[in-house]
Swiss-Prot record:
Gene expressing this chain: aqdC1
Alphabetized Pfam families for the sequence: Abhydrolase_6
EC numbers, comma separated: 1.13.11.-
Keywords of the record: Dioxygenase, Oxidoreductase, Plasmid
Function: Involved in the degradation of the Pseudomonas aeruginosa quorum sensing signal molecules HHQ (2-heptyl-4-quinolone) and PQS (2-heptyl-3-hydroxy-4-quinolone) to anthranilic acid. Catalyzes the cleavage of PQS to form N-octanoylanthranilic acid and carbon monoxide.
Induction and repression of expression: Up-regulated by PQS.
Active site: 250
Organism superkingdom: Bacteria
Biological source species: Rhodococcus erythropolis
Name assigned to this protein: 2-heptyl-3-hydroxy-4-quinolone dioxygenase AqdC1
Domain AB hydrolase-1 as annotated: residue spans: 29-158
Length: 278
């Protein structure tokens, strides 16, 4: 099945774009895709077809990102969650399982809070930095806010996220330029601010009341310094789980969409169709 057609809807002062396969025979829940900053529904072009035949799938685009990137007033992850929920309300989505890419995870956690446990019992976060930012990443977030250096900072980040693929990196740099300096600078500010406010995503997840099951799927880093704290957190919090997928990039939904989809389907079955948290 091909990607659904892009639709738009007016939410407040913003025209927001989204995909919806409108599968009427779908099993519960609807799968809702949330991209990272300066990304859009194309981020899920490999993952959506894996789920299209069984689930209703909706992919949300953030304000100012689609159908064509454009300037908007300032916003953060709280507004992203509000926009996503407004779209879901408008198109008649009741129970849903959100899936976020990278730092779309901040919006995913806020969306779980805003939607409540009756509608959103679980979430999947894809390759979200679970520890405090390293000095190098902190510097990169600052560089994104430099009108003279943001493009080079994007290029360096892309090399880190998908090494040994220079053609892909340059294609992403050209795509990055379409979103423009203001949006990339905003991403740096919001991501830095989120870590400053919450410490780590794991600490932010603990603020969800009542708790929801969240699964982290990632491939890198794979060293024990990164994985062990997640293992310890999972042992102390039964609602958190993780899976190390064994890939090489920051994009498991592009690199191994079948494995990501299998985790989504399994979590959906256990937490929605079975009606219990596991």
């Amino acid at each position: 099945m091909n990607m659904p057609q892009l639709s738009t809807i007016q939410i407040g002062d913003h025209e927001l774009a989204y995909l919806d396969n409108k599968l009427t025979s779908a099993v519960t829940p609807t799968i809702v895709m949330l991209p990272g900053w300066c990304g859009d529904h194309h981020s899920f072009s490999e993952l959506i077809p894996q789920l299209n035949d069984t689930h209703r799938v909706v992919a949300v685009n953030w304000r100012g990102h689609a159908p064509v990137p454009h300037d908007v007033s300032d916003f953060g992850y709280a507004e992203q969650a509000q926009d996503a929920l407004a779209i879901l309300d408008a198109i008649g989505v009741d129970e849903f399982l959100p899936v976020s890419a990278s730092h779309g995870g901040w919006a995913l956690v806020q969306l779980l809070v805003d939607a409540g446990p009756a509608r959103a019992r679980a979430g999947v976060v894809l390759d979200w930095l679970m520890r405090r930012p390293t000095p190098e990443f902190t510097a990169a977030l600052l560089s994104l806010q430099d009108p003279e250096g943001w493009v080079d900072s994007c290029r360096a980040l892309f090399h880190t996220w998908r090494p040994n693929d220079s053609d892909w990196v340059e294609s992403r740099v050209e795509r990055a330029k379409e979103f423009g300096f203001d949006m990339w600078a905003r991403s740096g500010r919001v991501i830095s601010g989120a870590y400053g406010e919450h410490g780590t995503p794991l600490e932010f997840m603990k603020t969800i009341t009542p708790e929801r099951h969240i699964r982290h799927l990632f491939s890198t880093p794979s060293d024990s310094d990164y994985v062990a704290p997640q293992e310890a957190f999972a042992s102390e919090n039964e609602w958190f789980s993780y899976a190390l997928l064994g890939g090489t990039s920051h994009f498991p939904h592009l690199e191994m969409p079948d494995r990501v989809a299998a985790h989504i389907v399994e979590l959906a079955k256990n937490t929605y169709q079975a009606g219990a948290m596991r």
